[in-house]
């Protein structure tokens, strides 16, 4: 059975997303796959290319033929060079930079506005002490001087 590594199209109009799959060469583009080994999103910046390198190496070793678009992707990831034993097996895949967290952006904007942040970005409300505790504290100091004056009178 002739096996090909090819792309299956997914996604909306003008926003293609592809699965990289291993399938019989005689099946249609969206036909039944033997195995899905990766995905490719060309519209993202930089393009998302995820290929399970171990499975791609296996299928290439047993004779699966990649189509031209898949061959280009395998060269970008370095899997084709690794399979052929050529230099440059690390590939030329670009990785997206991680986004800064929203808290960091908020603190940076706050620092620009009026200076460095004072602790947390949002201050919590102070909880009031229960009214009974306040009343007990207010009565206690008033009773102590009266007790002292009673002790002084008895002496």
Curated annotation (Swiss-Prot):
Classification via Gene3D superfamilies: 3.30.1320.10
Which keywords annotate this record? Ribonucleoprotein, Ribosomal protein
Which superkingdom, per the lineage? Answer: Bacteria
Q: Which GO terms describe its molecular function?
A: structural constituent of ribosome
What the entry lists under InterPro entries is as follows: Ribosomal_bS16, Ribosomal_bS16_CS, Ribosomal_bS16_dom_sf
GO CC list: cytoplasm; small ribosomal subunit
Compositional bias (Acidic residues): 136-146
Which Gene Ontology terms describe the biological processes this protein takes part in? translation
Is this entry keyworded Ribosomal protein?
Answer: yes
Name the Pfam families on file: Ribosomal_S16
The segment annotated Disordered runs over 113-155
Entry's PANTHER family? Answer: 30S RIBOSOMAL PROTEIN S16 (PTHR12919), SMALL RIBOSOMAL SUBUNIT PROTEIN BS16M (PTHR12919:SF20)
**What's the family?**
Belongs to the bacterial ribosomal protein bS16 family.
Protein name, as recorded: Small ribosomal subunit protein bS16
Q: Organism source for this protein?
A: Mycobacteroides abscessus (strain ATCC 19977 / DSM 44196 / CCUG 20993 / CIP 104536 / JCM 13569 / NCTC 13031 / TMC 1543 / L948) (Mycobacterium abscessus)
Q: What lineage is this protein's organism placed in?
A: Bacteria, Bacillati, Actinomycetota, Actinomycetes, Mycobacteriales
